């Protein structure tokens, strides 16, 4: 893996999809163990402005595809107390514009789960010429997920690794 770089991105519409994008999350369970899971990303688009900075980002995550390595836990997460995938199986993310930082960008945005919106700020840095890593922390209660803290901690750490497809030259 090459050293992180904050060089400007090529202006235009960058894309990523299920084969080039990974979203992972971490939360503590009742025994204070860290539970790690993944959510498939259906699609993502990054609109980059003429200054090489992301102006708009949109992504759709497939909640039905949640995978923590535990069939029972995954079933619970898909249920009404957590993601309620029968109601809507998609978690939407919209953000922008990005703010340049010495390490990359700060990307203020919003998650939308069943119409409940939650602000989230991603710290983004490049990990290669067309790849990025974004991290954020959020409180699951801000998305309306209200289960006892004895079951799962309220703070969730999210990491997204993306190999972006640049716009045509």
PLM-predicted stretches and their roles:
Residues 1-169:
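Low-complexity, acidic/polar, glycine-enriched regions of mature
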């Amino acid at each position: 893996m090459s050293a992180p770089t904050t060089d400007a991105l090529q202006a235009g519409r960058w894309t990523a999809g299920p084969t080039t994008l990974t979203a992972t999350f971490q939360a503590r369970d009742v025994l204070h163990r860290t539970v790690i899971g993944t959510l498939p990303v259906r699609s993502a688009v990054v609109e980059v402005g003429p200054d090489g900075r992301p102006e708009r980002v949109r992504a759709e995550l497939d909640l039905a595809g949640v995978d923590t390595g535990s069939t029972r836990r995954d079933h619970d997460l898909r249920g009404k107390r957590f993601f309620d995938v029968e109601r809507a199986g998609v978690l939407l993310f919209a953000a922008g514009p990005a703010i340049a930082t010495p390490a990359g960008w700060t990307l203020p945005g919003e998650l939308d789960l069943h119409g409940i919106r939650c602000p989230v700020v991603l710290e983004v840095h490049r990990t290669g010429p067309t790849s990025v890593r974004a991290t954020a922390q959020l409180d699951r209660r801000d998305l309306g997920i209200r289960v006892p803290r004895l079951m799962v901690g309220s703070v969730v750490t999210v990491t997204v690794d993306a190999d972006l497809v640049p716009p045509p030259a």
